[in-house]
Regions:
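Conserved phosphate- and dinucleotide-binding cores of soluble alpha/beta proteins
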Residues: 61-227
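Short, contiguous clusters of charged residues that form electrostatic/catalytic patches at enzyme active sites
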Residues: 9-17, 37-40, 107-110, 114, ...
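Glycine-rich beta-strand-to-loop/alpha-helix junction loops that act as flexible
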Residues: 32-38, 191
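HTH-adjacent hinge/linker in prokaryotic transcriptional regulators
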Residues: 1-32, 44-51, 65-67
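A short acidic, glycine/proline-enriched capping/turn motif at secondary-structure boundaries
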Residues: 3, 38-39, 62-63
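Short Gly/Thr/Asp-enriched flexible loops that form oxyanion-binding sites at enzyme active sites
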Residues: 38-52, 134-143
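Catalytic or ion-translocation cores adjacent to nucleophile or general acid/base/metal-coordination motifs
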Residues: 52-62
Length: 227
């Protein structure tokens, strides 16, 4: 809806301000970013000059919409602040076998993954489990099973239940929820009442230093925490 678009824009703008502040210390940073519409709003609103920063996608590609892929968002973000960037060309949700052979044989991919693993700032969106599963063109009966197993939220191709349990994960190169404790600053960027459960599931599944959200989602999360 139009209201959702406004919320995404505002959240993206707020997250851009926070990121600019973090990068303003003049140090060299590696920033990993995920894909999605809210993250695209962040990239569109970033300002300042940070030539010593390197921006990388948190994971490989997802879906057909190139504008919303992490690679594209990393590029736009870097170009808007005079930073450098790397791209990761690994298809989303390949078999573990194919993924391992890509990582073993493609030194370019391996080099980018190594940089991603050194990120000291991560900015990521949060998806609703059913919506993200449809984006990944999962079979309807598989999506139903995910939901029956309790999946409500998704980040980094990992599907989480409301209690933070990990229900399912897709194979991909890059960051996973398990990597988050090693990263200096983790910023989640998501809002809207419809995403409240998803946000809480991902926070519980990993760790979050800063959550940029809106009042509707925040109220909803607060209510769930009181229950």
């Amino acid at each position: 809806s139009d209201q959702e678009e406004v919320v995404k824009r505002e959240i993206g703008r707020a997250a851009a301000r926070i990121l600019s502040r973090l990068l303003g210390d003049g140090k060299k940073h590696i920033v990993a970013v995920s894909g999605g519409t809210t993250m695209a709003a962040l990239a569109a609103n970033i300002s300042g000059s940070h030539p010593q920063t390197v921006v990388v996608p948190a994971r490989g590609g997802l879906g057909d919409n190139v504008e919303l892929q992490a690679n594209t968002i990393a590029t736009v973000l870097a170009q808007r602040m005079g930073a450098s960037y790397r791209q990761l060309y690994v298809p989303d949700s390949v078999s573990e076998e194919i993924l391992n052979s890509i990582l073993a044989e493609d030194t370019g991919v391996k080099a980018v993954v190594d940089i991603i693993k050194q990120a000291d700032i991560l900015v990521h969106g949060v998806g609703q489990a059913a919506v993200m599963a449809r984006h990944r063109r999962m079979a309807p009966e598989f999506i139903q099973k995910l939901l029956d197993d309790g999946a409500v939220g998704e980040a980094f191709g990992q599907y989480c239940a409301l209690d933070g349990r990990q229900v399912y994960m897709t194979n991909n190169a890059g960051l996973m929820l398990q990597d988050l404790p090693k990263i200096g600053t983790v910023i989640g960027v998501a809002g809207g009442r419809s995403k409240a459960e998803a946000i809480l599931s991902v926070i519980r599944a990993s760790r979050q230093d800063i959550l940029v959200t809106d009042e509707a989602a925040a109220h909803c999360i607060a209510e769930m925490l009181e229950d």
